Amino acid sequence: MKKILAGACLFGLLLSACTPAAEPGDDGTLHILATTYPVYLFTTAVAEGAEDVEVSLLVNQPTSCLHDYTLTVSDMRAIEKADVLVMNGAGLEDFMGDALAASDAAVIDCSEGIELLPALGHEGHDHDTEYDPHIWMCEESALVMMNNILHGLGALDEKNLDCYRENAAAAAALVPEDDARMENLACPYLITFHDGFQYFALDNGLNLLKSIEEEE
């Protein structure tokens, strides 16, 4: 469990996501497709050991900005095959477009219940999203994401509800305590090379001075 969660920052339990019922695929397996790597980490943590459940990652290739991502043929096939789509939400998956609209899969939106920050604008980037979608960078928001997945999967797959609950509780127990080092920084300012650290800065009492993009 710790190995699965190590790369994701922070997690836990808090709100629920309401989604329609999902039916297992023809092979009797509930195919869950997580759109991004952080969402995949959270989903695999909750679903680990669940019977007849398979979790896959949609965007499994490096990309600096998902707003510029284009679905491949294999991506579209994965979406078509999925019984459940677990999404970051907050506009991050705008690239899915018509493929999402055509999907019959149940959808779990991890951003439900999270207070979103306005998106940071940068010259040369035409981001259509109104809000900053990098919600997993904040401990509290990551906890909500985990709980949304727990309740979403539990509603869709009651057979594995106890497993989901146990896994989510174990994940919550791994959430680290507040880092005192962040409270005593002599220079609590942050300059980053990506515009995804707003939530991290707010969560740790840092002042985000500048987000430098490669084009700059």
PLM regions and their residue ranges:
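Sec-dependent bacterial lipoprotein signal peptides
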Residues: 1-16
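Extracytoplasmic metal-acquisition and chelation regions
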Residues: 7, 17-216
